[in-house]
């Protein structure tokens, strides 16, 4: 909160020349024809008499939008201080913040977008910047390296101001993800905004510093201030060719104002790069360094982001053949694109005597890159057989070099009766270089630059009794919002594929003989829920019949089905479990020339885990890290916080900063590491939201050596993680578990559907984490998820409680949805007023604080020490009417 106050203080106190406040700064500069020139050598002489247009008439009336606020979803993140507009559609969960405005809202403001509604692309936390101490360093191949203060940038150079349309290279990516999942998240068609930017020319700054000639310096590199979790923990950086940076026709600026106000935190306060006609990924925010160099930027993000790879290239091939480093795959200038905005998604046009008497007006936007003017937009109602030319509106005037940096708007009138006979409408645009849009979508690994025809389906509906209407269906809706004809089409295709590939079990009784021998190739064929075989210490086991009874759920077996899992089995199972396994033994493994040796395989694995890691940046084949439950995912520790003397919050970076973990709510992961030459695996439930991008967080209690006489060695994995240095790798495997919360009270338990309007939750100690995950999911989906939750949380003392602060905050904010009762064995601090229970969780506690069962609408979720569950919780719930087989879900 203090950071937000400090930001407001900075932009109102002294971020500008001493005689100008932010809103008055426009007057200071424009009154002198664009700002007083400090050095005639810094700018072209033909700019002396140029007077920039007064853009205030465009953006001032449109700044009146409802205020941005601190979003509760940001409370537990490093962005808690940043105010954001509530209308923005979040695309990547809580953090980092990536969003776009709803398309109808965006278009309602016309040419200039209010800053609070401008789309946002952040890779990590928003830096807390101080105008008075912020500097931009210019170094490298320059004669006079300088660190400019913001005061020096504002007062030392001629200011320029003009509108620019910014577009993310991932605009319309969700359409690509409906065809095949790319490595990026779901941008809709709203990743575009136009605002008026004020700043200083980059070429003026470079010339002031004595930039060397093109023969010596070929590139200008930019680096931001934010420390990012992915890509080896580097800062965001990229570069431009020197010829672009120094070209007066390109209008590259270092911007410090947007729509007449200082930059907002999400948009780069106090200064950022603006490169008109380029993708947003080249416009570094929170600019700290400019390096003139011979070579391109060495930043991870310069090579591993903003590329269009050929459609046949997946992540594995991209890494193997170094496609990331091929210059022809780099995106700089925007391509030609257009979108239908009217009719809107789910808009209904009634067909009656009134509506058929006048034409319907279709509308939309179009843009192109490199300053190229959009010269024509066409609409078709018959799949491209015929086209109707639209009216174009270009609110901007070209620059003196003939460049167009902004979007334009198109409209066309169509007869309603024509719409009645059409199945879809589509739009395409042309620019002055005669570039146009392809008819069909061209998939690429990163889901970038999608610009196929924008198609809206037309369906007949009955909006009112006895009335016929047309309902319009856009391809997708942004983020995780449902809707769109592409989503429905994908669902139908998936269902048909699933029905066509279902097979009956191939696990047959005659295999149950210990004398049988199998090769590894034969074992690999049994890797499904219909037939799940594993190899442990050279023995082959058919675990198919045990899937439904496994305490950890079927997933724990299925992630290893068809493989030799000796090391993983030993890492997490007791001698008793090994004895139980024998009843499922069907034979022995024989090794052929084409099969590997389990012993050598285990030795090799240990050697690999112990060996120093070679960091090879790569992008995943999927937008989720846990795309294949059978494969371990290498993650790196990027942050570790001590929450108490024995509780740590670990943050691990996923392989790609644009990935989600891919863990369904209710399931957990295995963390794998080699300690003492042996594989150690432990199950943990992340506390980070399933929507988090680029990282996963685990809250873990450390069981130290010699603290508990029953376990003198302490916790092997927890102590290992506590000693793990930043940057060190661990492997994560999953998802694992038999319980999945699908939202709005729906659960899947071992493949069966369950539903509840009320949840009776009981947790003990670290067993709070899966329960916490469900609470988080329910509250995140408000107001759609109306599930009522009652939680009893037991610990030895108050200090042993995990996540209490957040649970209390949720309960206070949602008193009708979440009711919490704590129980401690003893009050650790008698001087503190303890208003909850003391003692053990028994039937009386459960009856007082949980709803009764047996009504078909209440489920119990339980996780904690086995003694607590078996001796008190389960018997108590049974007496309260819960069917322990159907109504009591144990994580």
UniProtKB/Swiss-Prot annotation:
Q: What positions does the entry give for heme binding? A: 550, 573
The chain positions of domain FAD-binding FR-type read 630-742
Q: Which GO terms describe its cellular component?
A: organelle membrane
- What residues does Mo-molybdopterin bind to? 168
Q: Where is this region: Disordered?
A: 1-78
Q: Which InterPro entries match?
A: Cbr1-like_FAD-bd_dom (IPR008333), Cyt_B5-like_heme/steroid-bd (IPR001199), Cyt_B5-like_heme/steroid_sf (IPR036400), Cyt_B5_heme-BS (IPR018506), FAD-bd_FR_type (IPR017927), Flavoprot_Pyr_Nucl_cyt_Rdtase (IPR001709), FNR_nucleotide-bd (IPR039261), Ig_E-set (IPR014756)
Check the record and name the SMART domains matching this protein. Cyt-b5
GO MF term (any one): nitrate reductase (NADH) activity
Q: Which PROSITE patterns match?
A: CYTOCHROME_B5_1, CYTOCHROME_B5_2, FAD_FR, MOLYBDOPTERIN_EUK
Keyword Chloroplast applies: no
Cofactor details (free text) = Binds 1 FAD per subunit.
> Per the entry, which co-factors are needed?
FAD; heme; Mo-molybdopterin
Q: Where is the Cytochrome b5 heme-binding domain?
A: 515-590
Name the chemical reaction catalysed here: nitrite + NAD(+) + H2O = nitrate + NADH + H(+); nitrite + NADP(+) + H2O = nitrate + NADPH + H(+)
Does the record bear NAD in its keywords?
yes
Record's function text: Nitrate reductase is a key enzyme involved in the first step of nitrate assimilation in plants, fungi and bacteria.
Summarize the subunit comment.
Homodimer.
**Family statement drawn from the similarity comment of this UniProt entry:** Belongs to the nitrate reductase family.
What's the protein name? Nitrate reductase [NAD(P)H]
Gene that codes for this? NAR-7
